[in-house]
Regions:
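N-terminal extension/subdomain marker
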Residues: 2-175
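Conserved small/polar residues in nucleotide/adenosyl-binding loops
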Residues: 177-179
Length: 179
Protein backbone atom coordinates (compact mmCIF):
# COMPACT_ATOMS: atom_id res chain seq x y z
CA UNK A 1 0.00 0.00 0.00
CA UNK A 2 1.47 3.35 -0.95
CA UNK A 3 2.07 5.73 1.92
CA UNK A 4 1.32 8.53 -0.58
CA UNK A 5 -2.35 7.68 -0.08
CA UNK A 6 -2.00 8.79 3.53
CA UNK A 7 0.18 11.87 3.06
CA UNK A 8 -0.87 14.63 5.39
CA UNK A 9 -3.31 12.72 7.60
CA UNK A 10 -0.85 11.61 10.24
CA UNK A 11 -1.28 7.85 10.05
CA UNK A 12 0.32 5.24 7.83
CA UNK A 13 -0.17 1.50 7.33
CA UNK A 14 2.09 -0.85 9.22
CA UNK A 15 2.92 -4.46 9.99
CA UNK A 16 1.23 -5.76 13.13
CA UNK A 17 2.01 -8.95 14.97
CA UNK A 18 -1.06 -10.39 16.67
CA UNK A 19 -1.54 -13.19 19.18
CA UNK A 20 -2.49 -16.51 17.67
CA UNK A 21 -6.28 -16.93 17.41
CA UNK A 22 -6.23 -19.52 20.22
CA UNK A 23 -4.48 -17.13 22.63
CA UNK A 24 -6.23 -15.68 25.67
CA UNK A 25 -6.78 -12.20 24.28
CA UNK A 26 -8.11 -10.93 27.62
CA UNK A 27 -4.81 -11.81 29.29
CA UNK A 28 -2.86 -10.46 26.32
CA UNK A 29 -4.42 -6.99 26.39
CA UNK A 30 -3.20 -4.39 28.86
CA UNK A 31 -3.86 -0.71 29.48
CA UNK A 32 -1.15 1.84 28.78
CA UNK A 33 1.79 2.10 31.16
CA UNK A 34 0.85 5.64 32.19
CA UNK A 35 -2.53 4.61 33.60
CA UNK A 36 -3.18 3.93 37.29
CA UNK A 37 0.12 5.55 38.23
CA UNK A 38 -0.96 6.03 41.84
CA UNK A 39 -2.63 2.63 42.14
CA UNK A 40 -0.01 -0.13 42.37
CA UNK A 41 -2.76 -2.44 43.63
CA UNK A 42 -4.41 -2.21 40.19
CA UNK A 43 -1.24 -3.53 38.58
CA UNK A 44 -1.00 -6.29 41.20
CA UNK A 45 -4.55 -7.41 40.33
CA UNK A 46 -3.66 -7.47 36.62
CA UNK A 47 -0.51 -9.44 37.39
CA UNK A 48 -2.59 -12.01 39.30
CA UNK A 49 -5.16 -12.20 36.48
CA UNK A 50 -2.48 -12.72 33.83
CA UNK A 51 -0.47 -15.26 35.81
CA UNK A 52 1.99 -17.04 33.52
CA UNK A 53 0.02 -16.42 30.31
CA UNK A 54 1.55 -14.35 27.51
CA UNK A 55 0.56 -10.72 28.04
CA UNK A 56 1.54 -7.23 26.99
CA UNK A 57 1.77 -6.60 30.73
CA UNK A 58 5.21 -8.22 30.50
CA UNK A 59 6.20 -5.91 27.62
CA UNK A 60 5.65 -2.61 29.40
CA UNK A 61 6.92 -0.78 32.46
CA UNK A 62 3.98 0.62 34.45
CA UNK A 63 4.84 4.11 35.62
CA UNK A 64 3.92 3.24 39.20
CA UNK A 65 7.06 1.05 39.15
CA UNK A 66 9.42 3.91 38.28
CA UNK A 67 12.32 4.18 38.67
CA UNK A 68 13.11 0.74 37.31
CA UNK A 69 16.33 -1.13 37.95
CA UNK A 70 18.25 -2.35 34.87
CA UNK A 71 17.23 -5.97 35.54
CA UNK A 72 13.58 -4.94 35.11
CA UNK A 73 14.38 -3.58 31.64
CA UNK A 74 16.24 -6.82 30.87
CA UNK A 75 13.16 -8.82 31.95
CA UNK A 76 10.95 -6.75 29.64
CA UNK A 77 13.30 -7.42 26.71
CA UNK A 78 13.31 -11.16 27.54
CA UNK A 79 9.49 -11.14 27.63
CA UNK A 80 9.47 -9.47 24.21
CA UNK A 81 11.68 -12.23 22.81
CA UNK A 82 9.36 -14.84 24.36
CA UNK A 83 6.32 -13.06 22.92
CA UNK A 84 7.66 -13.59 19.41
CA UNK A 85 6.77 -17.29 19.92
CA UNK A 86 3.06 -16.54 20.41
CA UNK A 87 2.69 -13.79 17.83
CA UNK A 88 2.12 -14.13 14.12
CA UNK A 89 2.12 -11.55 11.32
CA UNK A 90 -1.55 -10.70 11.47
CA UNK A 91 -1.41 -7.70 9.17
CA UNK A 92 1.24 -6.56 6.72
CA UNK A 93 1.16 -3.06 5.24
CA UNK A 94 -2.27 -2.28 6.63
CA UNK A 95 -4.40 -1.48 9.65
CA UNK A 96 -6.27 -3.45 12.32
CA UNK A 97 -9.92 -2.60 12.88
CA UNK A 98 -11.12 -3.66 16.30
CA UNK A 99 -14.11 -3.77 18.55
CA UNK A 100 -13.46 -3.56 22.27
CA UNK A 101 -15.76 -3.72 25.24
CA UNK A 102 -15.51 -0.94 27.80
CA UNK A 103 -17.48 -0.08 30.91
CA UNK A 104 -19.68 2.12 28.70
CA UNK A 105 -20.28 -0.47 25.99
CA UNK A 106 -18.61 -1.48 22.75
CA UNK A 107 -16.19 0.88 21.03
CA UNK A 108 -14.60 0.66 17.60
CA UNK A 109 -10.98 1.47 16.96
CA UNK A 110 -8.29 1.38 14.32
CA UNK A 111 -4.74 0.25 15.08
CA UNK A 112 -2.32 2.12 12.84
CA UNK A 113 1.13 3.62 12.73
CA UNK A 114 1.51 7.29 13.55
CA UNK A 115 3.57 9.50 11.27
CA UNK A 116 5.90 10.93 13.92
CA UNK A 117 6.70 13.86 11.63
CA UNK A 118 3.11 14.98 12.37
CA UNK A 119 3.46 14.64 16.17
CA UNK A 120 4.71 17.04 18.83
CA UNK A 121 4.21 16.82 22.57
CA UNK A 122 5.35 20.33 23.45
CA UNK A 123 2.05 22.12 22.86
CA UNK A 124 2.54 22.91 19.16
CA UNK A 125 -0.59 22.83 17.01
CA UNK A 126 0.45 19.85 14.89
CA UNK A 127 -1.85 17.34 13.24
CA UNK A 128 -1.22 14.81 16.02
CA UNK A 129 -0.76 15.99 19.59
CA UNK A 130 -1.34 14.58 23.06
CA UNK A 131 -4.49 15.15 25.08
CA UNK A 132 -2.44 15.45 28.26
CA UNK A 133 0.94 16.82 29.21
CA UNK A 134 3.98 14.64 28.63
CA UNK A 135 5.93 14.12 31.85
CA UNK A 136 9.52 14.57 30.71
CA UNK A 137 10.95 12.89 33.82
CA UNK A 138 9.34 9.62 32.71
CA UNK A 139 10.90 9.62 29.25
CA UNK A 140 14.28 8.08 30.25
CA UNK A 141 12.53 4.89 31.43
CA UNK A 142 10.55 4.72 28.18
CA UNK A 143 13.76 5.12 26.18
CA UNK A 144 15.47 2.42 28.25
CA UNK A 145 12.67 -0.03 27.40
CA UNK A 146 12.85 0.83 23.69
CA UNK A 147 16.64 0.71 23.47
CA UNK A 148 17.42 -2.74 22.06
CA UNK A 149 13.81 -3.90 22.28
CA UNK A 150 12.92 -6.65 19.77
CA UNK A 151 9.28 -5.46 19.70
CA UNK A 152 7.39 -2.20 19.77
CA UNK A 153 3.98 -2.37 21.38
CA UNK A 154 1.16 0.01 20.60
CA UNK A 155 0.49 2.17 23.59
CA UNK A 156 -1.21 5.35 22.47
CA UNK A 157 -4.80 6.06 21.72
CA UNK A 158 -5.61 8.73 19.17
CA UNK A 159 -8.95 10.45 19.39
CA UNK A 160 -10.57 11.04 16.03
CA UNK A 161 -12.78 14.06 15.47
CA UNK A 162 -15.33 12.38 13.18
CA UNK A 163 -18.86 13.34 14.30
CA UNK A 164 -20.34 12.08 11.02
CA UNK A 165 -18.70 8.65 11.57
CA UNK A 166 -17.16 8.59 8.10
CA UNK A 167 -13.93 6.70 8.86
CA UNK A 168 -14.15 3.72 11.20
CA UNK A 169 -17.82 2.76 11.02
CA UNK A 170 -17.87 2.23 7.21
CA UNK A 171 -14.79 0.00 7.54
CA UNK A 172 -16.44 -1.96 10.33
CA UNK A 173 -19.55 -2.46 8.19
CA UNK A 174 -17.41 -4.26 5.61
CA UNK A 175 -16.37 -6.90 8.18
CA UNK A 176 -13.43 -8.01 6.06
CA UNK A 177 -11.71 -10.42 8.47
CA UNK A 178 -12.54 -11.64 11.96
CA UNK A 179 -10.04 -13.18 14.33
Amino acid sequence: MSNDLFAGIGVVPGTFLLPRPDANWTAWACVACDQYTSEPEYWQRVNTLVGHQPSTLRLILPECDLPAPPERIDAIHAAMRDALNVLHPGVTDGFVLLERTTSTGKRLGLVCCVDLEQYRYDGAKTLIRPTEETVASRLPARLAVRNGAPLESSHVMLLLDDPQRTVIEPLYALSLIHI
